[in-house]
């Protein structure tokens, strides 16, 4: 991570389904840590804590929004999630941050609060019809495919 050592902010995010077919931030954090370990041959490079920081405050800095989000602090937007920790892959949990980065998946999220508003509770989206959104997305994708053929 020579760029981080030089003081360059590094953020982790998803580019969208068009680039990697996955919108899972946990997978993005995991890959950020694993790929740097692979490239450098150093298992200590990009720790779980560093990957989490890159995905939270690092992402907020990349967007120029570190004063409003990216960390849990008074005066910032109340954007939080709760995850299930009763999955076999998460037991025993010695280091919560390590487990968050290396074993958690997007479908482990059971509660999502954005700016203080509950968007999902018990894995059910409360603010929109998820089935309809999926149906509309598939229809739009079909239209794009037909248009480019």
Predicted regions located by residue number:
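His/Asp/Glu-enriched, well-ordered alpha-helical/loop segment
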Residues: 2-88, 101-105
